[in-house]
Amino acid sequence: RDFCLSRGLGDVYKRQCVSKQNSAMIEEMLAYNREFVKNEGYKEYITNKYPDKKIAILSCMDTRLTALLPAALGIKNGDVKMIKNAGGVISHPFGSVIRSLLVAIFELGVEEIMVIAHSDCGACHMHSEEMLEKMKARGINADYIHMMSFCGVDFHSWLDGFEDTEKSVRGTVDFIVHHPLIPSDVKVHGFIIDSTTGELTRIV
């Protein structure tokens, strides 16, 4: 299976190219960055790698939460370890989210985990078939999709969203609590944050 995937993905990588020309938006960010460093804007953000509050937060990558979530919780740079993905969920028992949580716990001193989903989440009601069609429309070769399916990739479980946000939070918390590599003394909490007001509702 690994050989099958590596052969197929190798072909994918061959047809990809890295853009050496920045878009106007990237240029704007780079210009801002130069001024930020020149004016020593970084000084107020200096901290170390250890989270002061000993908390890791798993949340969604939704743009509405970028500034809202920290502001609503009163957290600043250096307070917590923030892990984000689409939906704030765990899709694999040994994937990047669990790996990040293990690093946070065993290497960085995290003692509590907060799973924070949000209202009106884009991952809710997301369907793999629709996304696969969008991939094909953007030029992804259907043969790659078929090859990956043949090699064991379950696109439905990987790309499908969830129907019930509260149920998703409960499932994610349960997944973490019962994971064999997560210590039993680590406290795990589940919440839903309002994407507009920032109000937090405890689920677990």
Positions of predicted regions on the chain:
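Single conserved hydrophobic/aromatic residue that forms the stacking wall/gate
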Residues: 1-16
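Divalent-metal-activated hydrolytic enzyme cores
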Residues: 17-53, 88-95, 105-108, 123-204
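Divalent metal-coordination and catalytic microenvironments
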Residues: 33, 57, 83, 115, ...
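Conserved beta-strand-loop surface patch within small alpha/beta domains used
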Residues: 39, 43-98
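Short hydrophobic segments within beta-strands
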Residues: 58-60, 116, 191
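Gly/Ser/Thr-rich loops at beta-strand to alpha-helix junctions
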Residues: 61-64, 119-123
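Ordered, amphipathic secondary-structure segments that act as subunit-interaction surfaces
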Residues: 106-118
